[in-house]
Amino acid sequence: MVDIITERLIIRKTAADDWRDIREIWIDFSKSIYAQYDVPHSTDEEDVKQRIARWAQASNNVEHQFFSILLGEKVIGYASFNARENGYEIGYAFNSAYHGRGYAKESLSALLEQFKGHGVSTFFAGTAINNTPSVRLLSSLGFKKVGTEKVSFYKDENGQPIFFDGGIFELRF
């Protein structure tokens, strides 16, 4: 896939050198009230370097594709598209310094159109029902909530899972 250039952004396959900006996104996210609703990411430099190198390598196939979203030279967010039996599941994260400016919608709209142009007609996403900004973003992209599930990524002080309501969203073209 060639780079996608929107009005304000450049979207390209994730490169191993993107690790610094992605680490910054993960450090930023770990301080967010929404961090409790997502799988924790290691922010150790070596761990991040290795993980992003794997992402860059994986992006050479259609099963798992990772995209960096740039404003100028800065990676302000990323998106993942992971093949499922009947479509792709998407994931995304953006540095909070760039929230509320439409960058997520602009970049994800462009990526969804690119995949649609390659014959993909169904997309899935999951987010916590309490993550209002993410739910609002998915809705603005045309996703519909098709279900909910109890999800847990963390345990309490007694080792018991802490559950939250996760929404399952779907977009069909």
Residue ranges: model-predicted function:
Residues M1-S32, F66-F173:
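Acyl-donor (CoA/ACP) binding surface of acyl/acetyltransferases
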Residues S30-R54:
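Conserved GNAT-fold acetyl-CoA-binding loop/helix
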Residues A53-F67, G77:
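A short helix-loop-beta-strand connector motif used in the catalytic cores of GNAT acetyltransferases and
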Residues P40-D44, Q65, N130:
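Short, conserved alpha-helical segments within structured domains
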